[in-house]
Regions:
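Short alpha-helical patches at coil-to-helix transitions and adjacent helical residues
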Residues: 10, 177, 354-358
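Class I S-adenosyl-L-methionine
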Residues: 64-74, 87-277
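Conserved proline-anchored active-site loop of SAM-dependent methyltransferases
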Residues: 5-14, 75-93, 121-127, 180-182, ...
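Short, solvent-exposed loop/turn segments at secondary-structure junctions
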Residues: 11, 32, 85-87, 128-129, ...
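Short loop/turn motifs at secondary-structure junctions
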Residues: 2, 21-23, 46, 76, ...
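SAM cofactor-binding core of SAM-dependent methyltransferases
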Residues: 4, 8-12, 16-56
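Conserved acidic residues
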Residues: 51-59, 163-167
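C-terminal target-recognition/interaction regions appended to catalytic cores
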Residues: 235-478
């Protein structure tokens, strides 16, 4: 199968499709230094398929349309992926200017290409507030992104959209994202059938605890040149060396060990505007959300749980599920010294911070390749069953061993349970229902581990009831 990807960055997310054998027929990215990384990984088999430039510029658009038209005239486009820039969309920017609204229309370009070339599948990924963000539509009116997607694509596509934290898919860092999946209606497959099922949450200790401890600035692991101790101003060492796991330097009582500066001979403590700055991470927690400035203590959640340093590039790669074989430099380039590494380091860190984790699109694209996906009617029947039964209210019966189920059906049920817990409220994308309760936060989507009287986790009990009761229904999949 083939795919086209827009706003593709360094190709980190869509590398998951390459792993599964998909052919990249087109990769569009604005920055040449990001496309260069894609070339190092041989993302496309033809140089002309790398298109550098603004998708809105006539010359860039002409090249894109030429490739997509050729594909449509031949075997057709299988998958279209779009991950437009999130500046002007992020919840950090509450008040959007007309310029930002136009910038948000970058997603419109992807929507219109989807509409024109009719790929079998489309995948849009963006930040938490993506769906409700204002976007200039093709008729000149400003609409929410969700409405624009439905207006142009709902006629020909089954569409699902969810907001969730990618840590639920064994990606060892916290990254809350909106993922929209559409499947062309003639395929008669429901989008939920290709969304990955939730997996084990992985802690920092489990993911990077095996790597060599680094004690000195510029120290490089002799077995892995991307695992190194990034140097910093030695005056900062007292600020972090006594900081405990989960603690910020600003939590210390000794002012000399709090980030400070000397002004006219007087020590002045820096203002602690953000509790995530100068913060040491915890081994037993999920890894932090990786940002573009992972090179400095003053950015968010960048300090190693044990060593007095920021995370190395290898550690960042693991936290973003980027495989060890992924290349950042040409094959002939040797990264034997820190001086050589330094030439590429910031570009690599920025590329990682901008990216979508490789593993999620690897899981999703693997599901696309499955031949026996559940149909729209099948999944609607399961979802209807959730509504028809009192499954979330029955907590009094004793747990018994459930009846064995077909593996495909079992996984679909698990996905239905997981994704049905994400209540999609147009007025509040941050709300996540846990039974009749919800927690709300700007920083993360919280999934409760609330227990009931018999100490069985609610998720397990929900599975049990569904397994027991679903056999009594005359659903199409039986």
């Amino acid at each position: 199968m083939n795919y086209a990807t827009f706003f593709s960055g360094a190709g980190i997310g869509c590398h998951g499709l390459k792993i599964n054998g998909f052919d990249c027929i087109l990769s569009n990215e604005y920055l040449e230094e990001r496309i260069a990384i894609q070339r190092f990984n041989e993302k496309c088999d033809d140089e002309e398929r790398y298109i550098v430039g603004d998708i809105r510029e006539p010359e860039t658009r002409k090249k894109i349309e030429s490739i997509l038209k050729q594909s449509k005239d031949n075997e057709g486009l299988d998958v279209l992926i779009a991950t437009p820039p999130c500046q002007g969309i992020s919840l950090a920017n509450h008040k959007k200017t007309p310029t930002e609204i136009v910038r948000n229309s970058l997603i419109l370009e992807s929507i219109l290409l989807t509409k024109k070339y009719q790929p079998k599948y489309f995948i849009y990924e963006n930040v938490l507030g993506f769906l409700n963000s204002a976007c200039s539509d093709s008729d000149g009116y400003d609409r929410g992104v969700k409405e624009v997607i439905d207006r142009h694509l709902k006629k020909n596509y089954y569409i699902e959209r969810f907001i969730f934290n990618l840590k639920h898919f064994s990606i060892p860092s916290s990254r809350t994202r909106t993922v929209v999946v559409g499947i062309r209606k003639d395929l008669d497959k429901h989008p939920l059938s290709i969304y990955p099922k939730p997996e084990k949450i992985v802690t920092l200790k489990e993911s990077i605890g095996h790597l060599k401890s680094l004690k000195k600035p510029r120290e490089i692991d002799p077995d892995d040149s991307l695992h190194f101790y990034r140097p910093y101003d030695e005056r900062m060492l007292p600020w972090i060396e006594n900081t405990l796991e989960g603690q910020s330097s600003f939590d210390q009582n000794d002012k000399r060990r709090v980030p400070n500066q000397i002004i006219d001979g007087v020590l002045k403590v820096n203002e602690a505007k953000n509790g995530d700055k100068y913060k040491r991470q915890r081994w037993d927690d999920i890894g932090p959300c990786i940002h573009t400035r992972s090179d400095t203590f003053s950015s968010q959640n960048t300090i190693h749980p044990k060593d007095n340093r920021v995370f190395s590039i290898r550690e960042l790669m693991i936290l973003m599920s980027i495989p060890k074989t992924f290349r950042w430099v040409p094959k002939k380039t040797k990264l034997d010294t820190y001086e050589e590494i330094k030439k590429f380091e910031l570009n690599i860190r920025k590329a990682i911070g901008e990216s979508f984790p490789t593993r999620y699109l690897q899981l999703l694209s693997k599901n696309i390749l499955e031949k026996h996906l559940l149909s729209q009617a099948d999944v609607e029947a399961i979802n209807k069953y959730f509504l028809d039964t009192q499954i979330f209210k029955k907590y009094s019966i004793e747990l018994q061993e459930s009846k064995p189920l077909n593996v495909e059906l079992k996984e679909t049920i698990e996905k239905c349970i997981f994704y049905n817990r994400l209540e999609k409220k147009s007025a509040n994308p941050l709300k996540v229902c846990i039974g009749n309760n919800y927690k709300e936060t700007k920083a993360d989507i919280i999934f409760s581990t609330r227990k009931i009287d018999n100490k069985i986790p609610i998720l397990e009990l929900e599975k049990f009831y569904l397994y027991q009761l679903i056999d009594k229904k005359n659903l199409s999949l039986f």
